[in-house]
Amino acid sequence: MGVSGSGKSTLGIALGKTLSIPFLEGDDFHPKANIDKMKSRTPLTDEDRKPWLVALSKELLKHQSKGVILACSALKASYRELLSNSSLKELPFWVYLYCDSEELKKRLVGREHFMPLDLLESQLELLEEPKRALNLNNSQSINEMIEQIKRELNE
């Protein structure tokens, strides 16, 4: 979890390959209306996000027997609660990726994505840092972060 540009997808793909667990890109589950809204530089509301979070929650349920890695902003505690669906056999293991805002800006400028740089501030303002998560500064290498996650999962 983390704001746009924090490296969720990059880490998630690499971690999925390392652990032989499927990876899901949360952005792929946004309704077209949400994507259009973000492209028009309008921040999403809680109401906009709810159908997206419900869809992601259903995906987590589908994959619970073998596990899945999901890249999702999950900016607020209430979003994480919705994703920690009471129907799940196990609670999600949260990894919070963070980095300084200048690095985030550089990353967002250099990529093709429907989430424009203009909306980064709205995500940072909305972000409620998780109390129960493995916090990783993504200035580390992907391999270092994967090793930290593996150690945490084995404890």
Task: For the regions a language model picked out, list residue spans one by one.
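P-loop (Walker A) phosphate-binding loop of NTP-binding proteins
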Residues: 3
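Conserved lysine of the Walker
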Residues: 8
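Conserved substrate/cofactor phosphate-moiety recognition/catalytic segment
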Residues: 13-55
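Structural signal for short hydrophobic segments within the conserved structured cores
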Residues: 22-24, 93, 134-136
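Conserved nucleotide-binding/hydrolysis micro-motifs of P-loop NTPases
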Residues: 30, 74-76, 99-103, 141
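Glycine-rich phosphate-binding loop used to anchor ATP phosphates in small-molecule kinases
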Residues: 47-91
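Conserved phosphate-donor/acceptor-positioning beta-strand/loop module used by diverse small-molecule
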Residues: 88-107
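Small-molecule kinase domains that catalyze NTP-dependent phosphoryl transfer to phosphate-bearing small molecules
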Residues: 110-150
